[in-house]
Amino acid sequence: MSDERTPQRSSGPRKKRPFQRRKVCRFCADKQVSIDYKDPRTLRYFISERGKIIPRRISGNCAKHQREITEAIKRARNIALLPIAGSHASQ
């Protein structure tokens, strides 16, 4: 009975995922670039078009700088330097 319920795996060839190089944190690579909530031009790079914060696996930031970016984006939203919703959400 338990054999009937378990899904069988296909014995076909497995798809290989192309290897992508790990992105380097731009703030660790260049120490002169700083994270500042008063600089919306830099922070917009880390916000999707829907207004969501881009995760670190996509942006390539380290955990420390991703936390700082998240905090800076939230501060900038709070004082209306960045929109809370995306740029085309009001349409």
Curated annotation (Swiss-Prot):
Q: Which UniProt keywords apply?
A: Ribonucleoprotein, Ribosomal protein, RNA-binding, rRNA-binding
UniProt-listed InterPro entries:
Ribosomal_bS18, Ribosomal_bS18_CS, Ribosomal_bS18_sf
Q: Which GO terms describe its cellular component?
A: cytosolic small ribosomal subunit
Map out region (Disordered) in residue numbers. 1-21
What spans are recorded as compositionally biased (Basic residues)? 12-21
What is the superkingdom listed in this entry's lineage? Bacteria
Q: Which Pfam families match?
A: Ribosomal_S18 (PF01084)
Q: Name one GO biological process term.
A: translation
Q: Which Gene3D superfamilies does the record associate with it?
A: Ribosomal protein S18
GO MF entries: small ribosomal subunit rRNA binding; structural constituent of ribosome
Which protein family is it in?
Answer: Belongs to the bacterial ribosomal protein bS18 family.
Described function: Binds as a heterodimer with protein bS6 to the central domain of the 16S rRNA, where it helps stabilize the platform of the 30S subunit.
State whether it acts alone or in a complex, and with which partners, per the record: Part of the 30S ribosomal subunit. Forms a tight heterodimer with protein bS6.
Give the matching HAMAP family. Ribosomal_bS18
- Which named protein is this? Small ribosomal subunit protein bS18
Q: What is the lineage of its organism?
A: Bacteria, Pseudomonadati, Thermodesulfobacteriota, Desulfuromonadia, Geobacterales
Gene field: rpsR
